[in-house]
Regions:
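Conserved hydrophobic/aromatic pocket- or pore-lining residues that grip, position, or stack substrates
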Residues: 29, 51, 80, 112, ...
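Short alpha-helical scaffolding segments that buttress acidic/His motifs in well-ordered protein cores
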Residues: 25-29, 309-310, 356-364
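Structural helix-boundary/capping segments
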Residues: 31, 35, 39, 110, ...
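Short glycine/serine-rich loop/turn segments
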Residues: 72-214, 267, 316, 402-420
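Serine-dependent amide/ester hydrolase catalytic core
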Residues: 13, 124, 302-303, 326-434, ...
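An N-terminal boundary/leader segment
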Residues: 1-53, 290-292, 365, 483-490
Length: 490
């Protein structure tokens, strides 16, 4: 087995034991990217020179015994291209930021580097994280390693596809309405969306500030737990950051769900859910029940209102957040203009893609006088009711289980002409962001087309340890499946 097929923690152990050097790991990863990325288009920027230089630095630290407590020391990582990396292109996969190099690192980058991580590159995404397919990227779509005619999901599609294609051992993504969990489901990998406030957003280029959250995508639950343990923590630079009592998430990697109360909302299994996805999710629930969990179906209020509330709130915040991109201080500027107003108008028209413009227009509309109360305030009220619905459910259950997405990976181009269909694909994930809760997606089966199916587990705020334990226990009942194209090459 090639080292690129190892999990991040397995590679970390080999590096610590001196069986693999950091330079060898980096070179092996770069080789895989060169071999495969012309097909999958996972990367926007590959940091070959920087990664090799960093590998030598980290190797010295490991040899000096400085990184003993870091299980991921020396392991290369891919970073979603909306997370700031000092002096390295950070584009949000948009023309308007196609030349932007931040003057600072995001807090999560500082935390990873302090733990001995080596950043190998920046991965593709839907433009400004707006999309569910990674087809809205200015740098072209990313393809799903399981089937190149299918999308990898989004908006962290480059991150999930890179992990599945073994072009990255693990990656950092961001999740505003499902952008870590849905691509993880489509690409057959594991993705954790942490509780809002548990991971600093400082240096994450904002889409919807009250919903955005950075989290890990990896090949298994253990890797996700180790990465989350590394990046979580209070940060004074993020006003929504929260101090947690316990950051030892890898302690929860225990194969035991006895007595765990798991609820499945009936509304999650209704109309629009692919029968094969439903079967796989119910089989996962049955497995947990056989291992000692108590599994019940229940009614949960407000599920049907999550999509409209989410798109009103997220679009409103996006229209405000993206007003800073105007061609004056940084990023793309139109070469042809008459005055300052013309600069603003043409730069934004030429610099933003169609989906971003659509959401900014929706946002500007719902915030305008006459519609503010009817749409935005009402959406905030629905958000509060959704949170109450979850609170009521968690009075009875430890975990809520359901599908991550209503289908497996869609065909390329299928959703671009029908935005409403794309928005409805987020039906099981957006409510988790609206309530600020943690959620994890992990593989639970393969459909008749040979595409992976993901199951989602949702926990109470700051209950990641319970989620990790349940997900890890389920994961132990099936082996990790690799895409056929990857198996064929290794």
């Amino acid at each position: 087995m090639e080292i690129t097929a190892l999990t991040a923690l397995e590679l970390g152990k080999k590096i610590k034991a001196g069986e693999v050097t950091v330079e060898e790991a980096v070179k092996a990863q770069l080789e895989k990217i060169k071999e495969r990325d012309s097909v999958y288009n996972c990367y926007v920027t590959v940091m070959e020179e920087e990664a090799l230089k960093r590998a030598a630095e980290v190797q010295k630290q490991i040899d000096a015994g400085e990184l003993k407590d870091s299980p991921l020391a020396g392991v290369p990582v891919a970073i979603k291209d909306n997370i700031c990396t000092k002096g390295v292109l950070t584009t949000c996969s948009s023309k308007i930021l196609n030349n932007f190099k931040p003057p600072y690192d995001a807090t999560v980058i500082e935390k990873l580097e302090a733990a001995g991580a080596v950043i190998i590159g920046k991965v593709n995404m839907d433009e400004f994280a707006m999309g569910s397919t990674t087809e809205t990227s200015y740098f072209g779509p990313t393809k799903n390693p399981w089937n190149t005619e299918r999308v990898p999901g989004g908006s962290s599609g480059g991150a999930a596809a890179a992990v599945a294609a073994e072009e990255a051992w693990y990656a950092l993504g961001s999740d505003t309405g499902g952008s870590i969990r849905q691509p993880s489901s489509f690409c057959g990998v594991t993705g954790l969306k942490p509780t809002y406030g548990s991971v600093s957003r400082y240096g994450l280029i904002a889409y919807a500030s009250s919903l955005d959250q950075i989290g890990p995508i990896a090949r298994n639950v253990s890797d996700c737990a180790a990465v989350f343990e590394t990046i979580a923590g209070y940060d004074a630079k993020d006003s929504t950051s929260v101090k947690m009592e316990d950051y030892h998430f890898t302690e929860a990697l225990v194969n035991d769900v006895k007595g765990l109360r798991i609820g499945i909302p009936k509304g999650y299994l209704g109309e629009g859910l692919d029968p094969e996805v439903k079967e796989a999710v119910l089989a996962a629930a049955k497995t947990l029940e056989e291992k000692g969990a108590i599994v019940e179906m229940f009614d949960m209020d407000m599920v049907d209102y999550a999509i409209p509330a989410y798109y009103v709130i997220a679009s409103a915040e996006a229209s405000s957040n993206l007003s800073r991109f105007d061609g004056v201080k940084y990023g793309y500027r139109t070469p042809d203009f008459e005055d300052l107003q013309d600069v603003y108008k043409k730069t934004r028209d030429e610099g933003f893609g169609m989906e971003v413009k659509r959401r900014m227009m929706i946002g500007a509309f719902v915030l305008s006088s006459g519609y503010y109360d009817a749409y935005y305030i009402k959406a905030l009220q629905v958000k509060a009711l959704i949170k109450k619905g979850f609170d009521d459910a968690f009075a009875k259950y430890d975990i809520i289980l359901g599908p991550t997405a209503p289908t497996t990976a869609l065909k390329m181009g299928e959703n671009l002409s029908d935005p409403l269909k794309m928005y409805l694909g987020d039906i099981y994930t957006v409510s988790v962001n609206l309530a600020g809760l943690p959620g994890i997606s992990l593989p639970c089966g393969i459909d008749s087309s040979g595409l992976p199916i993901g199951v989602q587990m949702i926990g109470q705020a700051f209950s990641e340890k319970t989620l990790i334990r349940a997900a890890y226990s389920l994961e132990q009942t099936r082996s990790y499946e690799r895409p056929a194209c990857v198996k064929g090459e290794n």
